[in-house]
Amino acid sequence: MDFNFIEFLGYMATFFVAASFLFKSIVHLRIVNSIGAILFVIYSLIITAYPVALLNAFLVVVNIYQLWRLKQENLSK
């Protein structure tokens, strides 16, 4: 069996997204989920699955915004 980098990238994206839900900390969940979503964006652009890329790009933006919001809440305490 030959090594396929594109397929490996898809599996890594899946691993990060699935693993993110194992964290109790919402901060860690969002960081690991963002890594998976970024990998999915790259993977889906390579295989020209643009709806998947769009969804995961949106999720990255949501995760970054929520992490920023959590940081702002902690700074105001």
From Swiss-Prot:
Topological type in the membrane: Multi-pass membrane protein
Compartments reported by the entry: Cell membrane
* Alphabetical keyword list: Cell membrane, Membrane, Transmembrane, Transmembrane helix
Q: What is its main location?
A: membrane
- Pfam families for the chain: Imp-YgjV
The protein's superkingdom reads Bacteria
Record-annotated membrane-spanning stretches: 3-23, 35-55
The GO cellular component terms are: plasma membrane
Q: What protein name applies here?
A: Uncharacterized protein HI_1736
